[in-house]
């Protein structure tokens, strides 16, 4: 086997470390973007739920639902 030049090993180690750091930075950036988008979607879903509840209240759906519910003891 041929001996490996220490300078070559050192250069290869440096290149691999740089590559791994770049990959870690890219994954961190993507992770931050994904978390930001999930937070944004969560806020939008909360707003939608509130708007739907408000619309149902305005339409009187809650009143209609409570009027249509008959307790099990009163059913024939």
From Swiss-Prot:
Compartments in which it is found: Nucleus
Sorted UniProt keywords: Nucleus
Molecular functions per Gene Ontology: identical protein binding; transcription corepressor activity
Disulfide cross-links: none
Claim: Nucleus is one of the keywords in the record: yes
Domain of life of the organism encoding this protein: Eukaryota
Family label: Belongs to the HSBP1 family.
Function: Negative regulator of the heat shock response. Negatively affects HSF1 DNA-binding activity. May have a role in the suppression of the activation of the stress response during the aging process.
Name recorded for this polypeptide: Heat shock factor-binding protein 1
Organism of derivation: Homo sapiens
Gene of this entry: HSBP1
């Amino acid at each position: 086997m041929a001996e490996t030049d220490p300078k070559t090993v050192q250069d290869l180690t440096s290149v691999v470390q740089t590559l791994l750091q770049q990959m870690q930075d890219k994954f961190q950036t993507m992770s931050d973007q994904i978390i930001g988008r999930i937070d944004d979607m969560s806020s939008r879903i909360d707003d939608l739920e509130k708007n739907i509840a408000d619309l149902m209240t305005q339409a009187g759906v809650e009143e209609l639902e409570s009027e249509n519910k008959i307790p099990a003891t009163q059913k024939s």
